Amino acid sequence: MRFAPGLALLGLLALGCRSTPPPPAAASAPPDLIALTRFFASREANWGYRVSPDGTRLAWITSHRGRTTIFFKELASEAVGIIDTHTPRNVFGFAWAQDSRRVLYLHDRDGDENFHVYLASTEQPDAPPVDLTPWDGTRSWVHRVIRADPDHVIVASNRRDRSVFDLYRVNIGSREAMLIAENPGDVVDWMTDWDGRPRARLRHAGPDARQLEVWRGGGWAGLQAFDLEEFDVGLLGVTPDDRGLWLLSSRGRDRRSLLRVEIETGAETLVHEHPRVDVEWIRLSERTRAPLAAYAAPDYPATHVFDPVLAADLRRLRRATTTGLRILSLDDEERRATVEVFTDKGYEFYLLERGAEPRQLGRSHTMAFAHALATVEPIVVTSRDGLRLHGYLTRPSGFAAPGPLVLLVHGGHWVRDHWGYDRLVQFLANRGYAVLQVNYRGSTGYGRAFAELAVGEYAGKMHDDLIDAVRWAVARGIADPARVAIYGGSYGGYAALVGMTFTPEVFTCGVDVVGISNLLTFFESIPPYWKLSYAPRFLKYVGDPSRPEGRERLLAKSPLLRAGDVRRPILIIHGANDARVSVRESEQMVAALQAAGKDVRYVSFPDEGHRRDYGNWRNAVRHHAEVERFLAACLGGRRSTGP
């Protein structure tokens, strides 16, 4: 199966949605109660199948001895091996090095997000992995695996200056690291070509400005200027003729689109856009250096395939019009590929090979109890000021409506919710709760104009959108207004605290996970490497603490100062090593609530950080057992007697 480089365009899987779901059906018998461990610590979990560059081996993540690690096998003999990572913590992802003998993966220390790059061998899987970035207190990741150079990888690291990232060429045999691109203090992102040479960079050029520069004539030269919102730019790669750059960019347009930009002139050619939403991700061919597929998410997932041969192969994997497809990996010759096929019930993984039928490699453990899982429906809510808010509703199977509702608020706020399998959503639905997710104003994915509607609207119109979503669910007979919880992590945790303090009459209880309680102290404690990426947007959207009016605005929108207004129970959960939102945010909120005599329960994990996917399964199970007990007490849902 050689994937042709032509640009035959095939739009897959783009559907509309209903703004009004069908009326609640009469309740049938509820499904069996699914054990906590099957959602959050399953021994059957497996994902991330990737074929090696030479096409001879396959590797994936699966469970082993109470944690996730990397398995691999020979495609010819089916012989399976296990890489011993010599750590009790979970592995979440990996990449093949230049051949089938080595894999690369990241690990931090107890969730602190100071990631190190590790190299492990499939030839000696029991040998201790090699730390390629043994620099204490630093954050590193693999920027590029150079296919033509089996001895080196390009690594980004803040080794020299904790606030910015340089590029290093690291010898994976000797661990020698050579600095190849030093950050002058204002570079936000780098692009290297297919041989690992720095070719483009994005610079912070002022409070609301960015500059795209290219390496030309022995130095860096300006190519394009951006404002802050146009800075939603992704540097993808160099074009096949070496004269252009592939970018995902919203410069001069509302939606993020795939562009070709000429290196000499900066002239743009629009290659692909979605008519309704941003293009989120592009798969480039390592062989042809041309785009293979574009991914977007209008309501259900949409995959736009540029290559007609690949499109025909992927079409054979479609189960339904709502099926999502992701290309996970290809070998160097693009004769073999691994593909993820997903629905709202779970995932299946396939090997595509030229001249052969698709071969199933694995399926998520959830497929064994898919019949007990709920359906995720795209919805549209109209806000009080007439804005169309897209989101998702998951109604519990077998329960009468109206019933208890959990408003699940995504973090960010510069991200969005997507359709698909979400273990937290399905866990809550299995306990008898309807789950409502809304992409409130400011969520990414819906264009620049929608994102900018959030400027100045923390604890304002962004929160109004959440309240309007609850009212929508109540008006349609989905939610009992006396049994509504608000639950979120990170920004979503902040939103949960806002809900419990600014609108305490709306919510029966709230769950705040790694949330912000004081916007001023939060900004003062952000990691140094956020100064170029996150900080400018915070200043624009929320407020500038260096100015008196900015400090006043931040404090006015901080739940901490309204702890006395809380009326109902709150559960607060935080990882002690959180690098993004300091654990102090939860500690000070808990102290204020306790001083005011409020009903609050606090759970802290000393060996975790900010991630929703815990490094230790034991912590994940305890977290969700706490949530299960808390929601059962305040909303009346089901709970298990043990893990």
Regions found by a protein language model. Give the residues of each.
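Bacterial N-terminal signal peptides that target proteins for export
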Residues: 1-7
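C-terminal motif of bacterial Sec signal peptides marking the signal peptidase cleavage site
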Residues: 14-16
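Bacterial Sec signal peptide processing site at the extreme N-terminus
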Residues: 18-29
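Peripheral, non-catalytic segments that deliver or gate enzyme domains
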Residues: 18-19, 33, 37-47, 53, ...
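Short hydrophobic segments within beta-strands
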Residues: 248, 394, 408-409, 487, ...
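Short beta-strand element of the alpha/beta-hydrolase
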Residues: 401-411
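A fold-wide structural signal in alpha/beta-hydrolase
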Residues: 405, 429-439, 601
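Active-site-proximal cap/loop segments of hydrolase catalytic domains
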Residues: 440-643
